[in-house]
Amino acid sequence: MTKEFHHVTVLLHETIDMLDVKPEGIYVDATLGGAGHSEYLLSKLSEKGHLYAFDQDQNAIDNAQKRLAPYIEKGMVTFIKDNFRHLQARLREAGVQEIDGICYDLGVSSPQLDQRERGFSYKKDAPLDMRMNQDASLTAYEVVNHYDYHDLVRIFFKYGEDKFSKQIARKIEQAREVKPIETTTELAEIIKLVKPAKELKKKGHPAKQIFQAIRIEVNDELGAADESIQQAMDMLALDGRISVITFHSLEDRLTKQLFKEASTVEVPKGLPFIPDDLKPKMELVSRKPILPSAEELEANNRSHSAKLRVVRKIHK
């Protein structure tokens, strides 16, 4: 039985419109989720166009099959249940050598946060899980109860950027010596015990950064995004585009760096021309990230941290 995906798509029109969709093109939605981006992209394709939609969450695919039924009947959609880090291999298996555009909506989706049993949210009591792919072996429970102190500190600093990482890791160590930490609420309460009163008064939940860090570790989110975006740049046809929505500084920093490296070139001074093999492959479509409009911010609180970056392929 599938769980309904109630998901408000962020930066919907901006993300797809910036792809400059060709009606007969081949496109990829690397993060199907609630299928909002997929549905809007498909509305711009003719029946000769095609969309490949990736998601490692079976619930997302099951629900998208209902939402996108009219396009499925026309043979315009292929679903791929896999991590988008396998983008190139899975598209090659499907006989695709080049794509005209691809969009990414990074991070956890609203339905995953809202489904209590998935264990993503510090606001809802549930077993520690946080797997985007329910078939994966590593869970938040494993990280919290079996990672040693130094590994916990590493991921809390690296992926959560929490200045109380050492104290939180130590408190977790002490708590699990008494009994395993089994639920999201238990973990959130342990984190609260460490944070000083002035931190608890700040806007936002005190456990937010640590939960983010554990989720990124469980799903290797940054590693997967790095690999996938680089593969996407290789597979783009000339004039093809990549749209990437990020929701926190780590994702945005990674995307910005990948796009910068692909769109700039350093050549020795005095060269009369830039050799073809040194020319940048990509061009920034927008130098600054595109942000949600005031109307979207008012309608959807979860869009407040979203940033959209776009590049275009200019050289093979």
From Swiss-Prot:
Catalyses which reaction(s): cytidine(1402) in 16S rRNA + S-adenosyl-L-methionine = N(4)-methylcytidine(1402) in 16S rRNA + S-adenosyl-L-homocysteine + H(+)
InterPro entries hit by this protein: RsmH (IPR002903), SAM-dep_MeTrfase_MraW_recog (IPR023397), SAM-dependent_MTases_sf (IPR029063)
GO BP annotations listed: rRNA base methylation
SUPFAM superfamilies for this protein: Putative methyltransferase TM0872, insert domain, S-adenosyl-L-methionine-dependent methyltransferases
EC numbers, comma separated: 2.1.1.199
Annotated binding of S-adenosyl-L-methionine, by residue: A35, G36, H37, D55, F84, D105, Q112
Keyword annotations: Cytoplasm, Methyltransferase, rRNA processing, S-adenosyl-L-methionine, Transferase
NCBIfam families (alphabetical): 16S rRNA (cytosine(1402)-N(4))-methyltransferase RsmH
Protein family membership: Belongs to the methyltransferase superfamily. RsmH family.
Annotated protein name in UniProt: Ribosomal RNA small subunit methyltransferase H
Source organism of the structure: Streptococcus pneumoniae (strain ATCC BAA-255 / R6)
Lineage: Bacteria, Bacillati, Bacillota, Bacilli, Lactobacillales
Protein encoded by which gene: rsmH
